[in-house]
């Protein structure tokens, strides 16, 4: 699920392996306000109301990273896209690519 906003970009990923009973979720957010920050959240997800949501309504982990002031918005978006691409290489699928 890619949601674009004027001040924030957000992409959600899931990795599902029913044979191993593994349902993982991962969310990456880029806040474009000063200071620019990239927040990642991860944890187990379950399917509710047609979408994947965090199990027990909470994420298992969260990491927030402030980007240096000398980076402009384009550099921040590049770092954000690199993180998203790493998730895709590890087998995570974008919410929007799933068929319900």
Label each region the model flagged.
Residues 1-39:
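Short N-terminal "domain-start" leader segments
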Residues 51-75, 90:
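A short, exposed loop/beta-hairpin motif centered on an aromatic-Gly-Thr core
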Residues 43-45, 62-65, 83:
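Short beta-rich binding modules
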Residues 39-51:
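Short, solvent-exposed aromatic-acidic interface loops
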Residues 81-96:
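Short arginine-rich
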Residues 10, 19-20, 48, 66-67, ...:
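Intrinsically disordered, low-complexity regions of eukaryotic proteins
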């Amino acid at each position: 699920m890619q949601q674009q906003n004027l001040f924030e970009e957000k992409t959600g990923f899931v990795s599902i392996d029913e044979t191993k009973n593994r349902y993982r979720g991962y969310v990456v957010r880029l806040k474009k306000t000063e200071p620019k920050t990239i927040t990642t959240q991860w944890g187990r997800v379950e399917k509710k109301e047609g979408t994947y949501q965090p199990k027990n309504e909470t994420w298992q982990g969260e990491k927030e990273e402030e980007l240096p002031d000398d980076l402009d918005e384009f550099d921040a978006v590049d770092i954000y896209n690199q993180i998203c691409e790493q998730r895709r290489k590890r087998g995570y699928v974008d919410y929007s690519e799933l068929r319900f």
